[in-house]
């Protein structure tokens, strides 16, 4: 009998949710940036084993709503959590447990599904510091299990996958085993372009960027960017995108 289910990945901005989602899936399904609000839509990554399938929903960073965009993103997070079979709360070992983590823990406190905490970026802290953060994570009082992991090196990732597989309900696969994401090709391409825009510009927030991919017999790439960059941003076709905006 196969097991399958949906696991929502929650956490405040920039704790490494997208990097961890990519590590769990074993393929790049979510873009990565050090700028807030990089993940603006719920992205589904699909990890499949011989008799199990985890559909990982990489949620936008959870924070107290401050504007229309974050309010809409927050509502999407809440809807995805309602449909999940489990939840992974990601915290940052470097930064430790802060008010944002406690805010999310309170949101998840009433969840009807298992909640697991992943302390990410353990490769960047000492053993003594890690022990402190693991203790603080357990005090969040949400979920019974805390896993130290490094999405960058892969340490602890296999143990985390095995644990979630043990929690999955029995059921058929939702997607073909070879599929890693439910995102259409044009969306995946647009996100990859946006990742490069964010990497090469001086945006303080990723909410100022957008990309559009038009797929057809001759693919076109367009990006709207309102910042200055000293390097060209290239699409997979090799054509550079022209930056426009203020000086």
Provide a role label for each language-model segment.
Residues 27, 46-50, 62-65, 80, ...:
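Conserved, well-folded catalytic cores of nucleic-acid-processing
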Residues 113-116, 123-181:
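Canonical P-loop GTPase G-domain recognition
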Residues 1-6, 13, 206, 220, ...:
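C-terminal effector/interaction modules appended to NTPase cores
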Residues 8, 22, 41, 45, ...:
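Solvent-exposed alpha-helical segments within well-ordered globular domains of core cellular machineries
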Residues 202-244:
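Low-acidity, Ser/Thr- and Arg-rich intrinsically disordered low-complexity segments
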């Amino acid at each position: 009998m196969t097991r399958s289910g949906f696991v929502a990945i929650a956490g405040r901005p920039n704790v490494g949710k997208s990097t961890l989602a990519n590590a769990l899936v074993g393929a790049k399904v979510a873009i990565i940036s050090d700028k807030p609000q990089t993940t603006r839509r719920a992205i589904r990554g699909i990890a499949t084993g011989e008799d199990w399938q985890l559909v990982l929903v990489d949620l936008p960073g959870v924070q107290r709503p401050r504007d229309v965009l974050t309010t809409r993103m927050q509502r999407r997070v809440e809807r995805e959590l309602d449909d999940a079979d489990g939840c992974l709360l990601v915290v940052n070992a470097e930064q430790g447990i802060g008010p944002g983590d406690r805010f999310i823990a309170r949101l998840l406190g009433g969840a009807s599904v298992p909640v697991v905490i992943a302390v990410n970026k353990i490769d960047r802290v000492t053993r003594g510091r890690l022990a402190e953060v693991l203790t603080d994570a357990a005090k969040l009082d949400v979920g019974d299990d805390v896993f130290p992991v490094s999405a960058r090196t892969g340490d602890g990732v296999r143990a985390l996958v095995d644990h979630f597989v043990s929690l999955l309900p029995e059921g058929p696969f939702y997607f073909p085993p070879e599929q890693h994401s439910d995102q259409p090709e044009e969306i995946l391409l647009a996100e990859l372009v946006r990742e490069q825009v964010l990497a090469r510009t001086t945006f303080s927030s990723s909410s100022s960027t957008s990309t559009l991919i038009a797929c057809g017999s001759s693919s076109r790439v367009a990006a709207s960017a309102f910042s200055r960059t000293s390097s060209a941003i290239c699409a997979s076709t090799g054509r550079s995108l022209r930056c426009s905006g203020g000086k």
